[in-house]
């Protein structure tokens, strides 16, 4: 009887026991790399497709041959990104740790609840954003913008208002699918939506002559198509059956858990988005503002293109880490995090080589103005260095999201970008003679310090504690944050994100 008894005790105490006996670390890492690649490759294609959609819209905007319309549309897009899209994108990320950990824990109905809660949250947030957008002209005029450009910006953003509703559904649905490692349907849906985007814009802008209104309506129409394709997939594939318990009044509970994750996630996203907007404003104060602002626009588009790759990897790592924590597998979560970091280092090297290879020809894809070409060529190698830090730190942000520690990530971003990077950028650009180059050296300082901070966090993470926190998150999310008087409130424990060991 002793042997069976020992076996029972071992099975009950070793919660990390895996059905596959003692795989080597190398084989586990290789298998994990395959799992990450399976999720991230379709996401990269999806990102490239959606990037091309934005470029198509800008091309039709440029073909209007109306400088005030082009300026107004560009200004409206920047305003929409800062005051609307960044907020909705950031808030939606709050559901990611809940969904990935719930899927790993096989508590599938919680995914449907998180989807309902987050969609409702974004719809509610769209109301004050809409009020702000309705007053865009007054706001722009208050800050000294040209009246004609403000009029055009108002036209564009008023016709973009329905997009807030569409984004309130699109963001949660994407996360809902990604959390289950379902990414190919996202790619197919984006492909067909972008394929239709060209004739839609041609019809609205060129054939019907709607001009700036047509560009805005074309973007909305494409998002309607994208949302429709995703809903069709969810319904006909049956993927919703094990995760959807129908519309439930429980979606009005559990908001404290969601908000404690959503608000730091939103802050983290906005801090990065707003950094580039501040950089553009600083360009206007440099020695040659017209050339530097134009070059900054090209370089921001370039970094947005490169960012698709580490961002997709970050989402994949977040999914894998969260799934394993939810499945009570701390060792596998650790392997997922370290494997993702290794892949991101290789990705950073590739991004640096790309920036170096195209530095002398990239700007000519956008302009023939020699001063702009010269500035862009000068800064691209610095961007390559930035990507050495950006790719790993973006991936490690995914580790923090998957382990439900967005507050820690937001604090790191705040300190590194605004207390390190911004002062360095201002000092080098305006007081040390580096001018335009100094702004990007400031970004390099921010990315480098951010990477070091993230590496320290990863090295000190206690994965056993993270498994415990994952269980608590699942309990609170299911029970609607009701305090039973014995278990410490989830959000207090989530605030203690220093659950790290040396």
Curated annotation (Swiss-Prot):
N-terminal signal peptide: none
Main localization of the protein described in the UniProt heading: membrane
Family: Belongs to the multi antimicrobial extrusion (MATE) (TC 2.A.66.1) family.
Taxonomic lineage: Eukaryota, Viridiplantae, Streptophyta, Embryophyta, Tracheophyta
Disulfide bonding pattern of the chain: none
Organism from which the protein derives: Arabidopsis thaliana
Name of the featured protein: Protein DETOXIFICATION 49
GO cellular component terms, A-Z: membrane
UniProt GO molecular function: antiporter activity; xenobiotic transmembrane transporter activity
PANTHER family: MULTIDRUG RESISTANCE PROTEIN (PTHR11206)
Topology class, membrane: Multi-pass membrane protein
